[in-house]
Amino acid sequence: MTIRNRIRKQYIRLLCRLGWAIDISTVSRNPASSLLSNFTPFRFTFRGKDFTSIESLLQGLKAKDIDKQNSIFSKVGKAAWRQGRKCKWWKEQRLYWQGHPMERMSAEYRNFIREAFYALAENTDYRQVLLSTGRKTLYHTIGKSDPTRTILTEEEFCTILTEIRTKLQTEK
């Protein structure tokens, strides 16, 4: 980890302690922070398929084979993560939805991911947790920043959640 990254993490920790930010992580002591983790089991339906966590959807996208993908989709949280990490998607920078390829850096993929998180936000419990963060800045410092090495960067993740939260707040 670079010095710049260490300083950034310390700064974010300070913001969290002051109550101005949330660093989303499964190991956080902050309930909203840990519940917003992609590993947390929140049931939702997306494009006709039922999921038990957003992580199962994200990890399943790495599998080209539909049967393997559906198997990953059926897992929860870390179990899905363990299965998905075996897929070498980054070699071709391609992800899949039921046999349909999507380039990692494409607008199609970005829109797909946004749509998936909006579907997750239909879950009442998830929505309440997201709204409980108020106007705090969302971070995910455990996440990677290079989109060629991760299917969802920290910036993508937090931007989508902030967008959904803002939309939900204005609907109230």
PLM segments and residue spans:
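Charged, low-complexity intrinsically disordered segments
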Residues: M1-K172
